[in-house]
């Protein structure tokens, strides 16, 4: 499948060539970065859309303080963390369910709100966890191909809803393309979904949306009582290793999902990390902006060399077309691959991004394109959305 973005309609796909925050960045060896060295060459693993930065010093301090009490059990069922999140998003605590990452919460949703022999509708490609977890829950996956511009085909997904449909999932921004469904289209789609069918709105990358693209979650929930908004602390917050995710929605739906809440399943380190992260919203927003700028730098360089890339609103880029995975692999870069040979790569790590440029554009062309881009100012970018609207990073 070759994906074209609307802004690229006139351009053919051509692949040419074969503590302070600053001091921390100098010290850190990227989470994405050097996984191993083979024959002296650096190798990069960009498969998981990881945040390149470690937790902030204040977050590390909070986690270490919580670890001092690791001999004690956490809460039998989580109460503090749902309250923290509810206060942040403007909901009530009984409207929030937490779990082992967005993946764990999504599985809880499938197991409680759907059932064996029913169907789950989502786009294809999408977050890999959906078809895997659907199978675990005994659901049949109904995968709807993206449209010609590389976006989720919401109307195709609406047509795919039938008598056996028990659950629908929509990503915004979409994983893996990074495209964003227009607010009007999403609302029209949600309006058309029967009220007895729950809809997961996957906002794993919501913190990377611009203010114009962000939606008011409480307004959505007021209009669509069958909606569950799914989020994670793995991406913008850089806490993937702690496995903290949550969903919020109508309390009746959340009450059903909470039935599978694992006792003692949310460690105190997770609660401490979230509280400290909320307190460090300004610093975290700076990191989101830095990743966003780095993403646009890389996208600009690759597009100038003729590679057509959809505009992304995540901490990753989608590289459409056959041979992308293999080309990157030859340069020691592991990318998330798709059946047609397209690839998704994490962004934000400067060394890794430069390696991608060299692999896809060639060293000489990279120097020319980066100089031209810098001179023209195309690396400027839109700041992330007002955190009150886009996600969780607010002061």
Mark where each language-model region is:
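PLP-dependent enzyme catalytic core of the Aspartate aminotransferase-like
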Residues: 336-395
